[in-house]
Regions:
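Long, internal scaffold/assembly segments composed of regular secondary structure
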Residues: 226-328, 332-333, 337
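Extended catalytic-interface subdomain
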Residues: 172-246
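Active-site recognition of the HExxH zinc-binding catalytic motif
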Residues: 108-125, 280-284, 288
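Auxiliary, metal-adjacent structural segments of Zn-dependent hydrolase domains
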Residues: 16-97, 217-251, 488-500
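Short pre-active-site segment immediately N-terminal to the catalytic Zn-binding motif
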Residues: 96-114, 269-278
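Non-catalytic terminal regions of proteins
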Residues: 104, 108, 124, 299-510
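Sequence-structural signature of the catalytic-core scaffold of metal-dependent phosphohydrolases
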Residues: 135-164, 199, 203, 207, ...
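Post-HExxH zinc-binding segment in Zn-dependent metallohydrolases
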Residues: 124-186, 190, 283-299, 310-321
Length: 510
């Protein structure tokens, strides 16, 4: 009796089944598709464990904080009441690349999510320039262990409430705690531990209670002194947490280290939203290609392949703009997969329109090389600007609305002609620009020898001011870390006119 070529023939699975499926998927991914991946670690988890993974933003471990418990309860209540379902998998940008698979998955779904996460996402994490520039996959797990141990030690030494105040403030500012230009310094756990010891030893050696009895000096209020102190402090500075860690006058060394932990973890996540469309599009295209090849070679049967098609169809469903289930923006799985498939088509079977729009790509006969090049060298904004085709614009029935606040109606000002295609492509690409979503808030001045008031500036446009309640709540967190008054001015980026001012003072000592 000859052995069946099928990897499995039922919905049930065991670990030998997973190993056979993984080996077959790996051969196609690496030998046929030319994917380059980190070593994989596959973990099977329960629904309760998946909720824990959700709580920590997909990371396998983290420090204690009340916000994680709150997030766990929100996800748990939504899941238990049937308002939401859990993901089939979660994958972590680390080396080795960790993929969490739900134990409730069928044998087919386990194969699909291994192809999707362990090879699609894994290849993207390893090769995309954003992740190569901003993250250190080999060091993140060790650093998270250090962070958890350090925060726990601070809680034992200084009290949970004191640590919580610093974490609350740092979390509130985490989106303003990343270096957006020039790349990130690679994580080095030994250097971080050495620096933390040196900070503690320095604070102990420099302490002298007599310093508090000396009278203060009056600062010079001249244009030269303002320019000089701003130059000395490296202002303006957009990384608020970095500035707090280095300059805040009242922070102790352990508080500075906690701020550093929060901002380095925020830096690790910085590339993710900038490449979500590409990342999900890459992983979906990869899993669909691999599962199709498994079916073509007789390694999965028709029933399994129908399950693959059903799952993928659900994932890439794009509701219409006026559909009750629709919302602003596009489903990243749907648009990402459509663009990857369209690039493949343009490389192999281009139309005359494709040749006009993509002369360097159309008919080159190398769809895999073209896709790998795109995955490595673009982010969502530039990817849409470079590769969104008229065919995909028509398929998704895209159009552009002009929302003029002085008019009572909306105007459709870009439709399906050459000028409209270009306008739609530019507008959609701009919507993926991270600068369009995060306010440009920078430290612009502080007189450390004077009143120590911290001056922040938000460069914006009339009609695009910060919500007052949110701005004031966030400023209170800034003042908690700074220790003195903080003032935020919202300034017209074109005219330099001050549009609004917000002020916050630090809380009274407990």
């Amino acid at each position: 009796m000859t052995e069946s070529p099928l990897l499995y023939d039922s919905t049930d699975w065991d670990f030998r089944t997973l190993q056979r499926s993984y080996d077959a998927i790996e051969r196609i991914a690496c030998e046929e598709l030319g994917l380059e991946v980190y070593p994989n670690r596959i973990e099977i988890i329960t629904s309760e464990q998946m909720l824990d993974v959700y709580t920590a933003h997909g990371m396998p471990l983290t420090y204690r904080h009340w916000s994680y418990g709150k997030r766990f309860l929100q996800h748990e209540n939504s899941y238990r009441r049937g308002y939401s379902s859990l993901a089939y998998e979660v994958v972590i940008n680390s080396n080795p690349c960790i993929s969490y698979l739900m134990e409730e998955n069928t044998a087919t779904m386990q194969a699909l999510v291994m192809a999707h996460a362990a090879f699609g996402h894994n290849h993207f994490f390893r090769n995309n320039h954003l992740f190569r520039q901003w993250t250190e996959a080999s060091a993140i797990l060790d650093y998270l262990e250090f962070a958890r141990s350090y925060v726990s030690a601070c809680e034992d030494q200084h009290g949970v409430a004191a640590v919580e105040r610093v974490l609350d403030a740092a979390h509130a500012l985490s989106r303003h705690g990343v270096h957006k230009h020039g790349g990130a310094r690679p994580l080095n756990l030994k250097l971080d531990q050495k620096r933390e010891r040196e900070r503690r030893d320095y604070d102990e050696s420099m302490f002298d209670d007599l310093w508090r009895t000396l009278p203060g000096t009056k600062a010079k209020n001249t244009t030269d002194s303002v320019v000089e102190r701003r130059r000395r402090l490296g202002l303006p500075e957009e990384n608020l947490l970095y500035f707090m860690e280095k300059v805040a006058p009242r922070l102790q060394s352990w508080q500075r280290e906690i701020i550093r932990i929060v901002r380095l973890i925020a830096q690790y996540f910085y590339p993710q939203p900038q490449a979500k469309l590409m990342n999900e599009g890459c992983a979906t295209w990869v899993h669909q290609r691999i599962m199709t090849r498994l079916h073509e070679t007789g390694q999965i049967n028709d029933a399994a392949f129908l399950e693959v098609l059903h799952s993928t169809s659900n994932v890439i469903m794009q509701p219409g703009f006026d559909h009750p289930a629709g919302g602003p923006g596009f489903n990243p799985y749907a648009l990402g997969y459509a663009m990857m498939s369209d690039i493949e088509r343009i490389c192999v079977e281009p139309t005359e329109e494709d040749r006009r729009w993509f002369p360097d790509t159309a008919g080159n006969g190398d769809p895999l090389g073209t896709l790998r090049h795109a995955w490595a060298n673009f982010r969502d904004e530039s990817f849409v600007l470079q590769y969104l085709s008229p065919a995909v614009i028509r398929r998704f029935r895209m159009f552009r609305l002009l929302d003029d606040t002085s008019e009572s109606t909306l105007l459709v000002d870009a439709i399906h002609d050459d000028a409209g295609y270009r306008a739609i492509r530019r507008t959609l690409a701009a919507s993926y620009d991270p600068a369009a979503h995060d306010p440009d808030v920078q430290v612009v001045d502080v007189d450390l020898a004077g009143d120590r008031r911290l001056m922040l500036q938000h460069r914006t446009k009339p009609g695009q001011l910060l919500a007052q309640r949110d701005a004031e709540a966030t400023l209170r967190h800034v003042s908690t870390l700074w220790g003195y008054e903080v003032r935020l001015q919202e300034v017209d980026a074109d005219t330099e006119a001050v549009l609004a001012t917000h002020t916050a003072s630090p809380p009274a000592p407990a």
